[in-house]
């Protein structure tokens, strides 16, 4: 054991210089390799990774010392290059592995960026798709409330709160003004998107604002309670403004193409067709004189008659039910003539859904009906309005791109006959006025005819009075002839009584009575003559009085 320990002690110090020399040789080789390579990072990696095997070798040598130094040198020199060579390819293999990882990261980043861009685009599209309700849309109360709830508050096309307040006050106005309760109910019912039940402060702020401006006046109560009235503006400044405007040349009011488009779509849409229920609804609403609700058979008979004549085509259904389509000869429809046929024509044209139109037809319509000052500028405005309406959700482009293709109305639009065919309605109103005038004139003539009947009825009982008067005249006329001295004096009387031609027939009758009567009747004649001559003028009366005195004497 002692010999072993001594040998171990002698061998161990000898092995140390050999190991140190091997390390130095190895370090020189590593320096040469590092100079040859272009990557500076490998030095640190090699130094860190090469140290552990040397320590292991040292430990192994300490644990298992060998007697031969040459063998140790050979082993160390052989084992070290074997351990050194394999790490190089592993590092080189690690580098290409790192490169695909970085590529994968870049690809993932690019994919995330594309996803974000797609999300942004989708959000922008959603913002564009959000619909607002146009002013021309004909919706029922339930449809309007539903649409207003669906549309966002910011993009809803309602007026400002001040305008809504004045509108509500005018609508709810009574003798004592419009109460706040009635105003609140009106706004909640008509503008549900305001959500005034939760946000009551909007009404209070609007009331305060309008009171300060002097637009409204508080009749009763204080603060945000009581009754309010809209202050009427004086008309004098308006008159002066109108005079100033009248002095200058009045330019034609420019019509917005936004308001023109729905009517253009209804007129230009082809083919025009509508169901029986829609036709009946329209006719009963705008033509109450026809009484379609009470007498639906009239409408059914008119539809069947139009189909038989070839003025309409029945696409679906049988009899008077189903869908009917208008037929045209050129641009004019075949249907027309009577009031019922005209009502059916306007109903089918108005209730046709969906309403579509091409851009070429729209251009032609705008240039013909709304040419403006410059046609090119008008086409530019049409393009801009189409884009605006498409963003607002009023129109939808079915085919084509940009300023070409076909567009469709997204909301229903049912115009009245006066808007659809204003010329025909004006002609019809003139005809109706003429008919009414004729009826009134006939009624007046009928009213004028009965009065003569009444006069006759009144005259018939008065006939005996006339007879008595004639008898008195007959009795009076011969009495006038009796005094012979008076004929020369009383000459103006025949001028006042021209009907002397009739007297001869009447004069002949009393003559026999005078002959028949005895002489005793002469005493009665002067009394009668005195009574009747009292009716004569003053001169005659005085003369008659003198004669009466003479006769008495």
Swiss-Prot record:
Sites of N6-acetyllysine modification: 190
Compositionally biased residues, Basic and acidic residues: 91-127
Biological processes, Gene Ontology terms: cellular response to hypoxia; heterochromatin organization; nucleosome assembly; regulation of cell population proliferation; regulation of DNA-templated transcription; regulation of nucleus size
Classification via PROSITE patterns: H15
Classification via InterPro entries: H1/H5, Histone_H1/H5_H15, WH-like_DNA-bd_sf, WH_DNA-bd_sf
Position of the Glycyl lysine isopeptide (Lys-Gly) (interchain with G-Cter in SUMO2) cross-link: 64, 97, 256
Main location: nucleus
Keywords: Acetylation, Chromosome, DNA-binding, Isopeptide bond, Nucleus, Phosphoprotein, Repeat, Ubl conjugation
Domain named H15: residues: 157-232, 253-328, 335-411
Region described as Disordered: spans on this chain: 30-131, 231-251, 422-553
SUPFAM superfamilies per record: Winged helix' DNA-binding domain (SSF46785)
Ranges of biased composition (kind: Basic residues): 236-246, 488-509, 542-553
GO (cellular component) term, any one: chromosome
Modified residues (N-acetylalanine): 2
Keyword Repeat included in the entry's annotation: yes
Motif PxVxL motif: where in chain: 253-257
CDD domains with a match to the protein in the record: H15
Molecular function terms, GO-annotated: DNA binding; nucleosome binding; structural constituent of chromatin
Superkingdom as given in the UniProt entry: Eukaryota
Presence of the UniProt keyword Membrane in the record: no
Modified residues (Phosphothreonine): 51, 85
Chain positions with Phosphoserine modification: 6, 142, 155-156, 247, 441-442, 445
Domain comment, as recorded: A central region that included the first H15 (linker histone H1/H5 globular) domain binds at the entry/exit site of the nucleosomal DNA.
Chain's role: Component of heterochromatin that maintains heterochromatin integrity during G1/S progression and regulates the duration of G1 phase to critically influence cell proliferative capacity. May play a role in hypoxia-induced oncogenesis.
Subunit structure: Interacts (via PxVxL motif) with CBX5.
Name of the molecule in the record: Heterochromatin protein 1-binding protein 3
Lineage: Eukaryota, Metazoa, Chordata, Craniata, Vertebrata
């Amino acid at each position: 054991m002692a010999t072993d320990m001594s040998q171990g002690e002698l061998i161990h110090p000898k092995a140390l210089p050999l190991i140190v020399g091997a390390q130095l040789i190895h370090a020189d080789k590593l320096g040469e390799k590092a100079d040859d390579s272009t990557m500076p990072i490998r030095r640190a990696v090699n130094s860190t990774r090469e140290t552990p095997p040397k320590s292991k070798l040292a430990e192994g040598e300490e644990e298992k010392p060998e007697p031969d130094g040459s063998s140790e040198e050979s082993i160390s020199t052989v084992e070290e290059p074997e351990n050194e060579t394999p790490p190089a390819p592993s590092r080189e293999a690690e580098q290409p592995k790192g490169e695909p990882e970085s590529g994968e990261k870049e690809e993932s980043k690019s994919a995330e960026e594309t996803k974000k861009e797609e999300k942004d685009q989708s959000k922008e599209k959603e913002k564009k798709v959000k619909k607002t309700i146009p002013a021309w849309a004909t919706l029922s109360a339930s449809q309007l409330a539903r649409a207003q709830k669906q549309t966002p508050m910011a993009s809803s096309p309602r007026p400002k709160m001040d305008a809504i307040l004045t509108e509500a006050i005018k609508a709810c106005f009574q003798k004592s003004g419009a109460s706040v309760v009635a105003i609140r109910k009106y706004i909640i019912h008509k503008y549900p998107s305001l959500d005034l039940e939760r946000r009551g402060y909007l009404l209070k702020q609007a009331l305060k604002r309008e009171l300060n401006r002097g637009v409204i006046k508080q009749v009763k109560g204080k603060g945000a309670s009581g009754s309010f009235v809209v202050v009427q503006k004086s008309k004098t400044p308006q008159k002066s403004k109108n005079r100033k405007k009248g002095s200058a040349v009045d330019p034609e009011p420019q019509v917005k193409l936004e308001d023109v488009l729905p009517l253009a779509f209804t007129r230009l849409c082809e083919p025009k067709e509508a169901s029986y229920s829609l036709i009946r609804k329209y006719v009963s609403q705008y033509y109450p004189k026809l009484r379609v609700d009470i007498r639906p058979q009239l409408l059914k008979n008119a539809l069947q008659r139009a189909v038989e004549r070839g003025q309409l085509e029945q696409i679906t259904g049988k009899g008077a039910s189903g869908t009917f389509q208008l037929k045209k000869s050129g641009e004019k429809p075949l249907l027309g003539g009577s009031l019922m046929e005209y009502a059916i024509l306007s109903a089918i044209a108005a209730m046709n859904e969906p309403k579509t139109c091409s851009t070429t037809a729209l251009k032609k319509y705008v240039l013909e009906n709304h040419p403006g000052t410059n046609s090119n500028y008008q086409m530019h405005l049409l393009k801009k309005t189409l884009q605006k309406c498409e963003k607002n959700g009023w129109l939808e482009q079915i085919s084509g791109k940009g300023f070409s293709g076909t567009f469709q109305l997204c909301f229903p639009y049912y115009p009245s006959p006066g808007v659809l065919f204003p010329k025909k309605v004006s002609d019809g109103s003139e005809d109706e006025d003429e008919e009414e005038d004729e009826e009134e004139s006939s009624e007046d003539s009928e009213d004028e005819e009965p009065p003569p009947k009444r006069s006759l009825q009144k005259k018939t009982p008065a006939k005996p009075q006339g007879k008595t008067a004639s008898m008195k005249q007959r009795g009076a006329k011969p009495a006038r002839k009796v005094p012979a001295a008076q004929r020369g004096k009383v000459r103006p009387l025949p001028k006042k009584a021209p009907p002397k031609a009739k007297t001869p027939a009447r004069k002949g009758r009393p003559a026999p009575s005078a002959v028949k009567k005895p002489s005793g009747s002469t005493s009665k004649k002067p009394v009668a003559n005195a009574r009747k001559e009292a009716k004569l003028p003053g001169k005659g009366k005085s003369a008659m009085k003198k004669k009466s005195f003479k006769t008495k004497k």
